[in-house]
Amino acid sequence: MNKYRTHTCSELTIDSRGKDVVLSGWINKKRDHGNLLFIDLRDNYGMTQCIIDKSNQNFNSLEKIQLESVIKINGKVVERTKETINTDLQTGEIEVNINSFEVLGTCKELPMPVFSDQEYAEEIRLKYRFLDLRRKKIHDNIILRSKVISFIRSEMSKLGFLEFQTPILTSSSPEGARDFLVPSRLNPGKFYALPQAPQQFKQLIMVSGFDKYFQIAPCFRDEDARADRSPGEFYQLDLEMSFVEQEDVFQVVEKLIVNVFKKFSEKKLMYEKFPRIPYEESMLKYGSDKPDLRNPLIISDLSNIFIRDDVTFEIFKKLVKSGSKVRCIVTKNTKDKPRSFFDNIDKWAKEQGASGLAYFTIEKEENISARGPVGKFFSKEALEEIMKITGAEIGDSIFFACGKINDVEKITSLARDKIAKDLKLIDENTFAFCWVVDYPMFEKNEVTNKIEFSHNPFSMPQGDLKDIDFDNPLNIKAYQYDIVCNGIELSSGAIRNHVPELMYKLFSIAGYQKEQVDEKFSGMINALSYGAPPHGGIAPGIDRIVMLLANEKNIREVTMFPMNQNAQDLMMNAPSNVNEEQLKELGLALKLKK
């Protein structure tokens, strides 16, 4: 028999009554009723109510023990009276009469209670993360994470993928974020980098003749924290396949994602075959390449309306003439909304840094007209054209934004979310997945005016190689794709460029000399020169998948030991100083900014 327990704290049922049992766990809660002391004993699996009578010689000792101390109890299972049954507990029909107990681990005074649902400052929670992880909600999140990863591994194996581990110490490469650098003791003055992603290695695996690869890969990026992004490190389901096109990758990932979300969530899937939305369409209709398709509001372009002579809204007309764009959002049947509804949205837009949102409501008495601060500037014919473009009807309202394309996309995207939430249009019980496809290969840096890769430099451009318009690189589309759920990007992926000559050409457009490419990507370029198959892949974020399944808004709620927003581990006191001897051994000296 196990020394510490005969059962876990979730196992005992009405069928266990009369049994002598041994339980071990943490004291979750104590309730002293004078002659009776109630102990809620908790372990990883659940909770059992234990009781001790004042006549028991151990009563006074047990009464003094601090919450969250670990104890072992010996006792007998008894049936609860009908009125004391707790239907919220798996063990709620029984309790254990304590005969004796043993303290296995004492607990100091708690900096935060474990049994409480009260929210505490992040600093306290992260410093005492081992206590925070005992709280039921986050404890369940971490268990969910483990189960999701285990299920993913099983599904990937069924799909014919093999799991391989790629190096953690590798070379630095410009993949978008700053690298974490590791000095080499044996090669003074040189550095390893922790991988931002196993990008080059997984392609090399394909070149090595393996057909389908995956791993639950740790990735390291020296970037700022966000609610949906941990600083420092994160994990992704990294996968790559040989002899595939874009749709082949989509079919595998869709099957996996649908199975995962059906197994671990009761929420509905809006689509089991995810819509494919071209990047340009996504930026127009949703103002973002991370659209939330639960939101029915659609953005339309009305720039040409402000060229018309029968539209006299001069502020917008002048801006459009100088190159600005006008985008609008239609809200259905909002004619009876109070003026405060519209003014509050306009005020909110100004708080976001925009100049506001113009608006009017379409009405019809004898003729079509527009009610609102700017309605008088539009003729009947102009309103009819707006209705034709946007699908607006009598009784609908229209919000307008005007400005530079990037600014107007940003504010209309935010406004789309804001208005939908105010009107309660979003079904929170739904997952809406989609693919955003046809990303541009290149973009122009507005500050330097130089051509840069817009996403992954290793992507294959679309079209026959002989027909690619290298003279107009901003027109080149790539086989790059993102998978998005409820406005959250889960992953980027691509069909890879496996042709060295083409890779040199594309890097030259982005300003790289051949020598620079050879220096940065020598292993990759060399391998591709020895017979590389067409291949592609993707890497959905494990943290974000679990965040969605757990219905959490912050990724730190599904990460076991996260850092804070300053990339500090408050529990382990990292990063920390190192001694002079360590630095000397590495050939390093510190030169700190004053």
Swiss-Prot record:
It is an enzyme of class 6 (ligase). GO terms for cellular component: cytoplasm. CDD domains: AspRS_core, EcAspRS_like_N. NCBIfam families: aspS_bact, PRK00476.1. PANTHER family: ASPARTATE--TRNA LIGASE, MITOCHONDRIAL, ASPARTYL/LYSYL-TRNA SYNTHETASE. This is Aspartate--tRNA(Asp/Asn) ligase. The gene is aspS. Residues 199-202 are annotated as: Aspartate.
